[in-house]
């Protein structure tokens, strides 16, 4: 009887005692910018420089293009982005501002240097961007974003309802051949934007590396595009990466 009473007392004390604490999700590691794991997946490491050639086998000197990931920048509304500067002979041709939400990659703004023109993807007054990729993207996927594209010129701006569609497919063997190496697999990204605001017709993405092929007119209006294949990847300012500006590196 005494044993039964003691057992009942212990049970009641455990039932009424403090509940075990649970640790809230701390969110992504932002020590390297926005989301360290996602940045590594997409190749958006701050100060990383991708240099490209017009050839799939021979490096160019100087490179045909440099894509330089810059430190986190805050746009209006407090939206934090990673700017990527596209440079030719050291001069900026275009800037893409990317953000990462829930591991997904979004293009928020594209600026066309020397023209005063840019396009920003918004929902109402909020800078929301258009989706490019997810952490586990594979072939045969489509990401559709219905949004407003705000096109700014030097003295004016206009907002247009826009459908932005990113479709993924397996990259071909020829698209995966670069002066740097021949990759075994990757995703071809095909953009359909209606109406178009200077979107890239094609890119090739290799997970945990980045964009190994870029085809872009680097202008708001459609123009000639030449596919450019990666010839070198370096971290500017590091002992191995050198101090030369992106697009000025030695092959």
Regions found by a protein language model. Give the residues of each.
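Conserved functional acidic sites
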Residues: 30-251
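C-terminal motif of bacterial Sec signal peptides marking the signal peptidase cleavage site
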Residues: 12-15
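Bacterial signal peptide processing site
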Residues: 17-19
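Bacterial N-terminal signal peptides that target proteins for export
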Residues: 1-6
